[in-house]
Design a protein with these regions (language model features):
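Histidine-centered, transition-metal-coordinating active-site segments
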Residues: 80, 93, 148, 166, ...
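Histidine/acidic-rich helix-loop-helix segments that form or flank divalent-metal centers
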Residues: 111-113, 182-245
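Terminal helices and disordered tails flanking the catalytic cores of nucleotide-processing hydrolases
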Residues: 205, 240-332
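Active-site lining segments that contact anionic ligands and/or coordinate catalytic metals
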Residues: 134, 138, 192, 212, ...
Length: 332
């Protein structure tokens, strides 16, 4: 009756009944249509897209939990860009994730342009999906550049820049997760952290890599260092094969350096060789700011490679720093 088999063979998604009534009765069907298109690599019939455009505001009556469930399913599809391009075309994305819409477009001043960060983001997302099924890492890929519109600047000599977009973007993640009623637990922390660190390996790969810089990267990323590197490799979207090979080789060097430093210095999930209690007992003091200062100096010395990550050298430095702060060994 509705010729559904024919539509399936043609890879077309359309409603069996009047689409206006279908989408009006249950606005979540608009997102489901997009999700099915993304999961199956189907097309939504143009007339249905136009109806979704006209009914898009009704998505606001749907609970945020049901909306983010559909977003998660789109993110977990083989090629999520299909879904997000449809969300943009239908106007749903502007309502659900306006931060992404602001990434679209190319500015030009004096012949100098920047890339379209919306389509770049979708390329990164599709790239990362080839290497991981981790939903939250896919969220990182989707949101890693959302700070760029707020940090976009033009300089006559250097052209366009987005300095600090990682920091700004990481701050925006919380608002997005809260608005969409996504988990505000360790999953949020994971996404925020990787958005914040998203450019660090890129900077390292384009300069001479020092052990100190690698130690700090491992210290900041912890157990998520491998996911961070996967993100950075997915961020290579150049169409120049030689450049792509060069960037991938650079990241390979960074990965090898990470493995090297990690095996030698044991920085991942760093714990101070001596505790605050040990410092208090040694100097016979109560909790105070001096303890934090001593621990910070020890941490910095280890990350800089000035001392090894062990108790003996940490204790020696503790005594020197303590003496400089006017502390003396407590004699019972």
């Amino acid at each position: 009756m509705f010729d559904g088999v024919h539509d399936l063979k043609k890879g077309i998604i359309k409603t069996p009944k009047d689409p206006k009534i279908t989408f009006y009765d249950d606005p979540l069907r608009m997102m489901r249509a997009v999700r099915f298109a993304s999961q199956l690599n189907f097309e939504i019939k143009n007339s249905n897209i136009e109806i979704i455009k006209s009914e898009k505001e009704r998505i606001n009556i749907i609970s945020k939990e049901r909306i983010h469930e559909e977003l998660n399913k789109i993110l977990l599809s083989p090629k999520p860009s299909i879904g997000f391009i449809l969300l943009m075309k239908t106007g749903l994305l502007e309502i659900i994730l306006p931060e992404l819409i602001k990434l679209e477009g190319i500015d030009e001043i004096e012949g100098k342009t920047h890339k379209d960060n919306f389509y770049h983001t979708l390329q990164v997302l599709d790239n990362i999906c080839k290497n991981t099924n981790n939903l939250w890492l896919r969220w990182v890929a989707l949101l890693h550049d959302i700070g760029k519109p707020k940090t976009k600047r033009y300089n006559k000599k250097k052209g366009w820049s987005f300095h600090g977009h990682e920091y700004v973007g990481s701050k925006m993640v919380f608002k997005i997760f809260k608005r969409l009623k996504l988990p505000l637990n360790y999953k949020l922390d994971y996404v925020k952290k990787l958005v914040l660190l998203s450019s660090r390996p890129v900077i390292l790969s384009s300069s001479e890599i020092t052990d100190s810089a690698i130690r700090r990267l491992i210290f900041d990323a912890g157990d998520d260092i491998d996911d961070l590197m996967t993100l950075c490799e997915a961020d290579i979207t150049t169409k120049n094969a030689k450049l792509e090979k060069k960037y991938l080789n650079n990241f390979k060097v960074v990965r090898e350096k990470i493995k090297d430093v990690e095996e030698r210095d044991k920085i991942r999930n760093f714990q101070p060789p001596i505790s605050g209690k040990y410092i208090m007992d040694y100097f016979g003091i109560k909790p105070c700011k001096e303890i934090g200062l001593i621990k910070e100096r020890i941490k910095e010395a280890i990350l800089n490679g000035d001392i090894n990550n062990d108790v003996i050298q940490a204790k020696e430095l503790m005594m020197i720093v303590g003496e400089g702060l006017g502390l003396k060994k407590y004699e019972k």
